């Protein structure tokens, strides 16, 4: 039986070949999360970036075990804000609030 790649696998392969686009991907991931609140999609996207960077390397930089990081970013993960902040900082970014645009009716 042929095993087909998942969307995560395809995304990971793409960004491995195009690392210059990871910043836009990360920004868009958080932007979409701000709109729809879908944490499993955000965690999936962070998993992709973690695998590109290297889960063991990222876990060490964040101060977590490899298994702890994988669990936090799993589809059933419920990471604390300080974990997400540490992950984002280890990727070279920071969380920063941005004022919402007011809709004109």
Regions found by a protein language model. Give the residues of each.
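N-terminal flexible/basic segments that precede or flank functional cores
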Residues: 1-44
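Short alpha-helical DNA-recognition segment
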Residues: 48-70
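Short, charged recognition helix plus adjacent turn
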Residues: 52, 96-105
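The DNA-recognition helices of helix-turn-helix-type DNA-binding domains
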Residues: 76-77
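DNA major-groove recognition helix of helix-turn-helix/homeodomain DNA-binding modules
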Residues: 80-98
């Amino acid at each position: 039986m042929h095993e087909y790649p998942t969307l995560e696998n395809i995304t990971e392969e793409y960004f491995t070949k195009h690392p210059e686009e990871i910043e836009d991907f990360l920004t868009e991931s958080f932007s979409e999360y701000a709109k729809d609140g879908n944490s499993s999609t955000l965690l999936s996207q962070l998993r992709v970036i973690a695998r590109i960077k290297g889960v063991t390397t990222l876990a060490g930089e964040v101060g977590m075990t490899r298994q702890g990081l994988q669990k936090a970013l799993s589809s059933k993960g419920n990471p604390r804000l300080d974990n997400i902040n540490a992950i984002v900082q280890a990727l070279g970014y920071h969380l920063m609030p941005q004022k919402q645009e007011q809709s004109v009716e």
